Amino acid sequence: MSHFPKLLSSQIAYDVARTMLDGFDKHYRLFREVSHQAKLKFEAGDWHGLQQIQRDRIAFYNERVRESSVILEDEYDAENIEDEIWQQIKLHYIGLLTNHHQPELAETFFNSVCTRILHRSYFNNDFIFVRPAISTEYIENEESPTRPTFRAYYPGSREGMAACFERIVHNFQLERPFEDLQRDIGYVVRAVGEHFGDLRIAPNFQIHTLSSLFFRNKAAFIIGRILNGDRTFPLAIPILHGPSGKLVLDTVLLKKEQLLILFSFTHSYFMVDMEIPSAYVTFLRDIMPRKPRAEIYTSLGLQKQGKNLFYRDFLHHLQHSSDKFIVAPGIRGLVMLVFTLPSYPYVFKVIRDVFPAPKETTRELVKSKYQLVKQHDRVGRMADTLEYSDVAFPLSRFDEALVREFEQHAPSMIEYQRAKDGGEEIVVRHVYIERRMTPLNIYLQEGSDAQVEHGVIEYGNAIKELIAANIFPGDMLYKNFGVTRHGRVVFYDYDEIEYLTDCNIRHVPQPRNEEEEMSGEVWYTVRPHDIFPETFRTFLLGDPRVGAAFLRHHADFFDPAMWQSHKDRLLAGHVHDFFAYHASDRFIHRYGAAAEPPATPPVKQPDAGPARRVA
């Protein structure tokens, strides 16, 4: 039950609330500035610059939380503020958010500052936002009506499809010229027509596109939806730099599955300029209704809001379930203690206290590897992780075998405490949370011949894309990779990753005598960061079905020259192109660079005649 005061009588309470909101506003101003820079760097083809601002942005939030906490400590002795004043601080903050355009993000920022200042055993739910206090429904940008969240276009009543898409592209005002926009628009219209076929045009037929481009890797994406009758279809158009150096429309994505992969947890976060982020999330949920809001916020670079929503969803699931957390099935890891809740599609990973041989690492080194992945381009091949500290679980929901695992292998990472309802809790001091996937080793063991073929192709492609992005996985056993629900192979064990450019790629030396040739041990010198691709055969080709498929599709995997060529390109400053869609979907492959799209007349107003094609 809440015990808020009836009167807000403290000037300090208002000043603290104002200081905290000023800290958030500064954070979000800098966050949006990165999106402005992303557009300029995309237009200039400054790929290294894009990567740098993406990395820098990840640290912005914690820097502003730290900065605000220091100000509050120095100016208001915040740690010693009385409970009644903290309650007034929250109420003043709510008042300040009444007409704010990012209230949900500001509430999360308030929680971050509050929990940084106060120990978890001290702050209570009256001090922080356990649930949203300000609605994000129907927030409009009334100050700048020319910058709506999305723009609506009516191809059936005005310009026709080709003119409509041309206007959509021009409205983003990209400074770099297009190679041949008329050609590419023709491809878009042709692809839309092929996808929808004989679709009757309804009176409300229209196209909506979000007002800002989505920047990631070397692409800028137009994201939208097509409305026709009571149906909504997703729309995404990636814009790339073509071989000529000018811009091209690379494809058009029109399936929900394609958008889900584009916004997958295996990709880096987008850079998007959003005045009202909740409106963007609502729009994206409309075209991806299965996507949790937490994941959408995270994919937009608002990972702290994603963490906040994920934790709320998790607590809600705990309240409405009764199964127990168990040790995750499968091969036990040497670095991580992994557990899961069978009814929840995630795994929880805790760093062990001691690492048995042959592992040689430390807790801090493992954490640094996970942070490296957070900051690096994951290219659709590395799972994102949510990192939490001091998470309290009901002890009654922990299987006894799991408790024993903790007490034996990670006792320093847990403590027990009494919950406010009188029950016992187990507090996990540090945990990573990842999407649960089918381990690749199990997928290959139990799969059909076609599934084995698919798994091997995906595994090889995943490794090649990772090394093209300057990531050497280190431990490449199949058990360290998972298969997503879309059939993509993803890496998720990061404790041994290195930059490929830091590695020495070597041939196995020729034995100098019979004793070396017959030796069961490695007889040649191996230094840190040495890689011997020829030796990968030993642990990758053991299963006959897997081995045969591997040699059919990735025989170059065991050739040091393949690995060295990637390293050389990276050292020369090359930034690889990565696509979150199949190569066969690209216009250059689908229609051919020189193919002339068919002439497409404008779509007419709907009438009582027979069904017509969209294009």
UniProtKB/Swiss-Prot annotation:
The keyword Transport does not apply. GO terms for biological process: glucose metabolic process; glyoxylate cycle; tricarboxylic acid cycle. Keywords: ATP-binding, Cytoplasm, Glyoxylate bypass, Hydrolase, Kinase, Nucleotide-binding, Protein phosphatase, Serine/threonine-protein kinase, Transferase, Tricarboxylic acid cycle. Its main location: cytoplasm. Residues 595-615 are annotated as: Disordered. Its EC number is 2.7.11.5, 3.1.3.-. It catalyses: L-seryl-[isocitrate dehydrogenase] + ATP = O-phospho-L-seryl-[isocitrate dehydrogenase] + ADP + H(+). Pfam families: AceK_kinase (PF06315), AceK_regulatory (PF20423). The active site is at D384. GO terms for molecular function: [isocitrate dehydrogenase (NADP+)] kinase activity; AMP binding; ATP binding; phosphoprotein phosphatase activity; protein serine/threonine kinase activity. GO terms for cellular component: cytoplasm. InterPro entries: AceK_kinase, AceK_regulatory, Isocitrate_DH_AceK. ATP binds at A328, P329, G330, I331, R332, G333, L334, K349. It is found in: Cytoplasm. NCBIfam families: PRK02946.1. Bifunctional enzyme which can phosphorylate or dephosphorylate isocitrate dehydrogenase (IDH) on a specific serine residue. This is a regulatory mechanism which enables bacteria to bypass the Krebs cycle via the glyoxylate shunt in response to the source of carbon. When bacteria are grown on glucose, IDH is fully active and unphosphorylated, but when grown on acetate or ethanol, the activity of IDH declines drastically concomitant with its phosphorylation. Belongs to the AceK family. This is Isocitrate dehydrogenase kinase/phosphatase. It comes from Cupriavidus taiwanensis (strain DSM 17343 / BCRC 17206 / CCUG 44338 / CIP 107171 / LMG 19424 / R1) (Ralstonia taiwanensis (strain LMG 19424)).
